[in-house]
Amino acid sequence: MARGLKKHLKRLNAPKHWMLDKLGGAFAPKPSSGPHKSRECLPLVLIIRNRLKYALTYREVISILMQRHIQVDGKVRTDKTYPAGFMDVVSIPKTNENFRLLYDTKGRFRLHSIKDEEAKFKLCKVRSIQFGQKGIPYLNTYDGRTIRYPDPLIKPNDTIKLDLEENKIVEFIKFDVGNVVMVTGGRNRGRVGVIKNREKHKGSFETIHIQDSTGHEFATRLGNVYTIGKGTKPWVSLPKGKGIKLTIIEEARKRLASQQAA
């Protein structure tokens, strides 16, 4: 007889983008319930131990967290399996470091180092807009936030710029043709480009056609697209490569060129 949720996660069943080696043990950290889906997040233990290399063991990670050194979106987090996700800001005041979680073009999480000024805000995609008791309007964001009394012009799929200190909407970006977006799901995850056109299919998924800065075009579902700036200028700094996916041949040529230069 089943008794509630599974408390364990086998390593082979963990998401591929966590990049855990097969022979590193039998189990992987099971993410706690939180603002991001378990298959679309990166637990804090993996950020500190596997990515930043600030700890060698699980126990060392717990020690760092219990000293309240790690902040996610401006709040101290002590849960070792807290699910940090796309666009979250991970701050370590002790070392004066800030990182934003973004995707690389292979669909894996990249801890992108950012300045203090950029760590004060994050971009949140609007999931839905509803009315509560007494007709009070509120919006829900992709990371589980509820914000009351938003601007009436904000609609679902738009992106809001959220001040993390005051938890207030500073600005917003309309989900429109001509704006720069990042793909957050599917085979094109991590790619950045400008929306060229929207294809509406009644009773099915809306298709978005995107063109990257090299002129390559690709298409994806509406749910996979996340607006990150107005026009062609993103509001957040992007990791190395700027979201341009290279072909296998282009990657090989780039590798050869770097080897010859070295």
From Swiss-Prot:
One CC-aspect GO term: ribonucleoprotein complex
PROSITE patterns assigned to the protein according to its UniProt record, in alphabetical order: RIBOSOMAL_S4E, S4
Domain S4 RNA-binding: 42-104
Primary localization class, coarse: cytoplasm
GO biological process: translation
Xref: CDD domains: KOW_RPS4, S4
Origin superkingdom: Eukaryota
The keyword Signal appears for this protein: no
Recorded coiled-coil stretches: none
Gene3D superfamilies tied to this protein: 2.30.30.30, 2.40.50.740, RNA-binding S4 domain
Localisation per UniProt entry: Cytoplasm
Pfam families: 40S_S4_C, KOW, Ribosomal_S4e, RS4NT
Keyword Ribosomal protein: yes
Sorted UniProt keywords: Cytoplasm, Ribonucleoprotein, Ribosomal protein, RNA-binding, rRNA-binding
GO MF, one example: rRNA binding
NCBIfam families: PRK04313.1 (NF003312)
Family: Belongs to the eukaryotic ribosomal protein eS4 family.
The protein's name in its UniProt record: Small ribosomal subunit protein eS4y
Organism this protein belongs to: Arabidopsis thaliana
